[in-house]
């Protein structure tokens, strides 16, 4: 990681794949996920996501995270790399930065692009760790945008993410599982099957809370459009 790159918004990254740029809309505070979840007690649940897409070296992580979101239960949409890149480029046109000369875009723009394609009708936001635990347990998988730290590139044979080292850039990924006994989330990444445990990794609640508090965001679709059979 010795090459410094610039993505949209003027952010610098140490890895070309890190293309998530923060874009917060104050109006999002009116659309928290907690108001839609009646349950108060956390539960463990994993939303299966069969495809494992690989973004390659392109900073299209937002598009791939949203494609994985669509491919996961509860409303499965066939996901391909073409779909992921289509969402990514549409998000670039919808975000707050002019032009397409820079790589990267925001999770919010990805949500808008996914909605524009007719795949979902409504999305909400998880503001904090408890919101995310309840959202994954009851509502469905979430698309996260966080800082990616140097220590998160190497997850080891056990497939664990540890938030160590300096920030390397912003990354978007799917969180499709939560375990209450383990106090972990499951991350479904877009870096191929050789990363982590067949493309997935575990991250502890404490580390996740740190990421969320450090300009992190978690978008949760709550009204998905099921594809016609």
What annotation goes with each model-predicted range?
Residues 1-229:
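Catalytic-core signature of thiol
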């Amino acid at each position: 990681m010795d090459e410094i790159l610039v993505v949209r918004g003027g952010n610098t990254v140490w890895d070309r794949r890190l293309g998530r740029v923060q874009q917060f809309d104050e109006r999002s505070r009116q659309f928290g996920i907690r108001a839609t979840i009646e349950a108060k007690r956390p539960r463990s649940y994993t939303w299966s996501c069969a495809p494992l897409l690989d973004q390659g070296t392109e900073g299209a992580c937002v598009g791939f995270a949203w494609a994985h979101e669509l491919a996961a239960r509860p409303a499965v949409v066939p996901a391909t790399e073409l779909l992921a890149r289509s969402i990514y480029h549409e998000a670039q046109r919808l975000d707050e930065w002019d032009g397409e000369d820079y790589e990267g875009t925001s999770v919010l723009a990805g949500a808008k692009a996914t909605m524009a394609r007719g795949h979902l009708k409504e999305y909400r936001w998880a503001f904090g760790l408890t919101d995310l635990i309840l959202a994954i347990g009851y509502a469905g998988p979430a698309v996260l945008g966080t800082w990616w730290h140097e220590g998160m590139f190497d997850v080891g044979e056990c497939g664990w993410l540890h938030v160590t080292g300096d920030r390397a850039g912003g990354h978007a990924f799917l969180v499709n599982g939560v375990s209450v006994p383990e106090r972990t989330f499951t991350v479904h990444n877009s870096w191929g099957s050789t990363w982590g445990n067949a493309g997935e990794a575990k991250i502890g609640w404490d580390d996740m809370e740190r990421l969320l508090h450090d300009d992190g965001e978690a978008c949760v679709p709550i009204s998905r459009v099921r594809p016609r059979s």
